[in-house]
């Protein structure tokens, strides 16, 4: 039965239609915020997937180009693979949803959000987040909802709830917070060096707004919610754990995991697994789940060590950072390079500079975002964790990590006017044992400075973890988590920033939310840690951007011309500009405002191109001298090209001080001659003279 529900949210109407579409899905709703419309659905398989030790949740966010009145580009004229924005939005939707499903649930679940119409006043990503939580809560799929999501912008220091697209892009804060009735469950932020206290204020304001959305969802569930279906639990039997402890006592497991060497720990666990497999050889059911059982045994052991004994697997104190190292100029001939090492996590970052014509083109739903000038790409090869696997290109994780490190540096990058380059940073993971995205942030910051990019401040990043007990007051926040603490802990709270404030946050958890004291402690810890990293390690390798770009990087000269003269520089069908490029070997970019960038590696050729452009666009006065080439000879005179696409005529009477009968007696096609401007002739053409050129010229 069709029902429609509405509420006012930040000055706009949020409408949810239930029972109108997609009746065969486990849960479906047509969600509208203003005119932005997203179809949200959720489906689940009838039976659990066998032979897996994880929850198979898939989240899709589909950007339909018809939603903004566009036909997709390309040959097929239909939507292709997901855009980077769609992938990142899917990840943001996934992170608050995943912890609210039962931990022992193994049925396949797919959440899909299809963007059908976009109102610039209401961001479709937010609608997808609200719709995902709503349809899963009203469905028959086991889910401990509801949760809700709010976005917060900031313009001129004022916080704006659910900002429109312009406020979101041009403001100083892009914050997304998901929460349950009592706790924060996900934080994602990009910021322009926002102070910690202001960030906390924005987070708590989002949480308060979320409560109104949760009340709205509760109302819908009361009328349209389905009874949750029963499912087959995939939990490890307690009797199996008891048998494992008889064979491998807790003290033995603790000894196996207590080492700062990842490879040693993994070898210890392999030996324990082999020992248990031998003991359970006749129990096929237990053998089938032995890997997951050993994982859970490790997890319980590590959590107890941290929570009860304040003892970390590698012996560090709770707030201690792993050994750090930083260096620049590791790779020769590239435009900039740096390596950052934290324990057994090591990132090499390489920066490449190029003219603005090399910016990444973006074909998305936002008409105001068509290019991306700064690109950060993150690679995670199998060898970084000692595995063998064929690389098949970046996956969602790699794209997400690259985007986070990219976001971390955006606030400190120079403007196009200050530094007219396209910039690409590539983070190569040499070694991984947790928090490679934060190491990528540190490495890329140093690499940018080494490349001569005049960033406004140094940026560093660090991640905090968490282990909780049975009550909200029983918890331990860990500074700089390694892989094991990430896998077995409850939180990965990544924060990047400068001395002044925060530039990015990404928080995801495995429990049902964080209390305010935990959020505050994590933000305070990350500030303390990142200041230490910048002051004691990164600044020792490089403390400020180099004044010049690398000798191997392209050089750029910028000039401004009258926008009305752009056509003269370009010429008919690009003839003039292409001739300048052919003569000098440079690249030329011209903006609609008349800003011209001349890019090349040969400074002489670049200056020659600039002179040509200035010559073409300058209004000439009588008496100016030029050097040009004879390009045409007529009975009455010769035409001299003094700049690409620019010609003036020398009348036969102005060629020589002596009388001549034929132009060819003195001039030949291709001759280089010096001429003086005599003004314009009756036809408006530049009139030149050769004979009146001063002898000293």
Model region roles, listed by residue range:
Residues 140-260, 448-547:
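Mobile "lid/hinge" segments at catalytic clefts and subdomain interfaces of large enzymes
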Residues 25-110, 115-117, 122, 188, ...:
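Glycine-rich, flexible beta-strand/loop modules in the N-terminal catalytic cores of phosphate-handling
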Residues 290, 552-556, 563-697:
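Single-stranded RNA-binding regions, centering on S1/OB-family and related RNA-binding modules
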Residues 1-45, 53, 230-369, 554-568, ...:
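Extended amphipathic alpha-helical scaffolds
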Residues 103-109, 144-146, 213-231, 263, ...:
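Flexible, glycine/charged-enriched surface loops at secondary-structure junctions
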Residues 27-29, 122-141, 328-351, 433-453, ...:
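Conserved phosphate/anionic-ligand binding catalytic regions in large, soluble enzymes, centered on
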Residues 113, 185-190, 231-235, 246-256, ...:
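Short, hydrophobic beta-strand segments
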Residues 1-232:
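Long, basic N-terminal domains or extensions that often function
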